[in-house]
């Protein structure tokens, strides 16, 4: 029905040990908003096994992606998925590049710690899974479900994944009420009729 100025492209890095709900909820919400979403494995295989032993296939491998056309990159949490993301050269390269270019960098649960380690949270407001606050180097921490500070979006965990996905859509569509309302109605989001 609607057309967003220039199709927005979102990538989500998937690592073995990721929290599947945090990752796949964002994929679902972004696709419901009719934005282009690509699931990206950080290993040499498309198959990813989550922290709760759910195995799924990604769209592509990080080594095969041209990230130039992307508008946002997302990091789901989970353990040891977050550690795997943090240890990935390509993840660190892309999040730093996107942050410097003003593109959206979004992380949930433990994954904001990867942003902290990369120096991307200095002086920024951010949130994370309880117990990871010390790893948000330089951040002004919050207990809010989702925190948007410029082009950095952070969230607390599986229970906030829908709000996290909606925040990503809101930022990418410049808070287009028609798009966001369509998604909220489609997922029977709380108070969607008021939105």
Segments predicted by a language model, with ranges:
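Short, Lys/Arg-enriched N-terminal segments with co-localized hydrophobic residues
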Residues: 1-6
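N-terminal beta-loop-helix "entrance" segment that forms/cooperates
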Residues: 40-59
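Short N-terminal binding/cap micro-motifs at the start of the first secondary-structure element
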Residues: 18-23, 47
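Active-site-adjacent pocket-lining segments in enzyme domains
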Residues: 9-12, 18, 33-41, 59-195
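Histidine-anchored nucleotide/phosphate-binding helix
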Residues: 27
